[in-house]
Amino acid sequence: MNIQYIVECLALLREKKPLVVNITNYVVMNNTANALLALGASPIMAHSQQEMAEMMSFSGALVINIGTLDSVWTPRMHFAVEQANLNNKVVVLDPVGCGASQLRTQVARQIAEAANKLIIRANASEVIALAGENAQSKGVDALDSSDSAVGAACYVAQKYQCSVVISGETDYIVTQDAQYKLNNGHAMMPFVTGMGCTHTALTGAFAAIGDESGVVATAVLGVAGEIAAEQSAGPGSLQMNLLDTLYQLDEETLTRRLKLTVNA
């Protein structure tokens, strides 16, 4: 894994325009769809069980976000994972609020257990809760630092044979054979709702075209968010500027600004 590979993945995504199936929450559907489009992918928000087998037969990846979880959505998520497995597609799980309630923790663990090809993108508290440890969370927001969740991420990666992306002031990605640390992004980003959900959706887009998609998506969003925040007066303008920056992000800028450490 190196910066050149990340640059090549961005170019390939824009060329291939992969279709990403999203079962995501009501709060962020617009944000994540626009971010995927701005980057160059093709989003579809598919929540009907009747069409899921068809959708997963020709999509590139499945993103599951449990942010507005209920008894109607849960069986649909499980069925979607079954179809992703049948079609050998990657499942990207965002266990929003894992640890905040027994329901969220239980469903997140069930999905993680069921998926054959899995990436988990979460904040530190969610990762710690997924590992079965005591996490500090306030609703869906993390009170733990990303640094404190690396050990839990290693455990989760081994338990579910997956990659784990920890979002925070410093981002960490734990895979089966490596650890990565990225120091991009901006302190304003957590003040925009759904920024982590966007991170998850972009991970799904890159999962549709290559390996190590957690690292690639984290790099792209971190650099884009950093640039967008520098041009923004506050969270409102950051939302708009992020879409523009994802659309305009070029290889030279990504290469110059990326702060990546391998085997951190």
From Swiss-Prot:
It catalyses: 5-(2-hydroxyethyl)-4-methylthiazole + ATP = 4-methyl-5-(2-phosphooxyethyl)-thiazole + ADP + H(+). ATP binds at R121, S167. GO terms for biological process: thiamine biosynthetic process; thiamine diphosphate biosynthetic process. The keyword Magnesium applies. Its EC number is 2.7.1.50. Catalyzes the phosphorylation of the hydroxyl group of 4-methyl-5-beta-hydroxyethylthiazole (THZ). HAMAP family: Thz_kinase. This is Hydroxyethylthiazole kinase. The lineage of its organism: Bacteria, Pseudomonadati, Pseudomonadota, Gammaproteobacteria, Vibrionales.
